[in-house]
A protein has these predicted regions:
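Amphipathic, non-transmembrane alpha-helical secondary structure
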Residues: 49-60, 81-88, 92, 110-121, ...
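Active-site gating/metal-coordination segments in enzymes
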Residues: 65, 73-169, 178, 296
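Short aromatic-enriched loop/helix-cap "lid" or pocket-rim segments at secondary-structure transitions
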Residues: 25-31, 80-81, 113-114, 170-173, ...
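Catalytic pocket-lining loop regions of alpha/beta-barrel enzymes
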Residues: 30, 126-127, 140-251
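A cross-domain feature marking catalytic cores of carbohydrate-active enzymes
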Residues: 19-21, 70-71, 102-106, 129-132, ...
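Conserved, mostly hydrophobic/aromatic
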Residues: 18, 87, 100, 128, ...
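Mid-to-C-terminal alpha-helical segments outside catalytic/metal-binding sites
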Residues: 1-17, 24-61, 65, 246-251, ...
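Active-site environment of divalent metal-dependent phosphoester hydrolases
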Residues: 20-25, 73-76, 106-110, 164-168, ...
Length: 297
């Protein structure tokens, strides 16, 4: 599934743009254990944390490409992040299925932006992931702007968590996590300030689904991934827009390992999506956003 160091897009049935690396090769977790356990309980997941090589094998078996990343929350939680370099190097060992994104805490400022530039230039990183609620920043407060400047310069997408999160769910005070920081309307500001940056709003953005649809409809550089929810629970307005106005701007994402691609795809097959739109969501839109070349007919 790989040609000359790149994904062989024609060999893939789909591209999953939202896959978490939750543990590194040394057993270090991406999040504090109590927050990770809360998320697993929220999703009814089995608490299993596959390693990067295991994820590669899982996706290769299914002929699915996967965008992989961690979430750097070190400044807010004090928990050291999984190495972006390790993820990028691991993805380079599995170029037929894995596409690496970085995650850098916006609190790291210009130093973080320099680190991101090195990851792009020296390690082949293809985008950046943010989780405003867990990283404790508002997307429009400019703290992430040095990182976004680098992403825009290189033409790389920025993936932002939006809506409610399972991380910290049920813990006292929600583990200190503020949901309002993941309101997709905050990304409307970012889309104005970075008109040439590709922005992906992750997840059906409960309780702000209509806001997310409005931003994605109004701003040509804003997309939506469908991760974190089984398609059978998608709000009707999301399905309606995915079938019409946003058919070229909606992307398959699972949120693995919390939701498996098998479960997501099985439920998506039962969703009332137009036959002409289905391949766009599963692969073609991701090919465009990730700069993987023309998708074959």
């Amino acid at each position: 599934m790989e040609q000359n160091g790149r994904l062989d897009v024609a060999a893939l049935q789909a591209i999953d743009v939202h896959v978490h690396i939750e543990v590194d090769l040394h057993g270090h977790l991406a999040l504090p254990d109590d927050q990770a356990q809360a998320a697993a309980k929220y999703f009814g997941a089995d608490h299993r944390r596959p390693t990067l090589p295991e994820i590669a094998a899982h996706y290769r078996e299914r002929r699915i490409g996967a965008v992989v990343f961690t979430v750097d929350t070190e400044a807010y939680t004090g928990h050291p992040a999984i190495s972006n370099e390790e993820i990028a190097e691991g993805a380079a060992e599995h170029p037929d299925v894995l596409i690496p994104f970085a995650s850098i805490d916006p609190a790291k400022g210009r130093a973080g932006a320099r680190a991101f530039r090195r990851l792009v230039e020296d390690h082949g990183v293809r985008g950046i992931k943010f989780h405003p609620s867990v990283q404790d920043f508002a997307p429009n407060d400019r703290s992430a702007y040095p990182l976004l400047e680098v992403a825009q310069e290189f033409g790389l997408p920025a993936l932002f968590h939006t809506g409610q999160t399972g991380i910290g769910a049920g813990l006292p005070g929600g583990g200190g996590i503020r949901l309002e920081l993941s309101n997709p309307m905050l990304l409307d500001h970012v889309a104005v300030d970075f008109p040439h940056l590709t922005i992906i709003m992750a997840h059906p953005s409960f309780p702000w689904q209509d806001e997310a649809l409005a931003v994605a409809t109004h701003k040509p550089n804003v997309y939506i991934d469908l991760s974190g929810w089984s398609p059978k629970y998608f709000p009707p307005q999301l399905v309606r827009y995915a079938n019409s106005l946003l058919q070229d701007k909606v992307l398959f994402g699972s949120d693995y390992p919390l939701i498996t691609p098998d479960r997501w795809l099985a439920d998506f097959a039962k969703l009332e999506i137009k036959p002409t739109v289905r391949p766009k969501i599963l692969k073609e839109n991701a090919v465009k956003v990730l700069g993987l070349g023309a998708s074959p007919a």
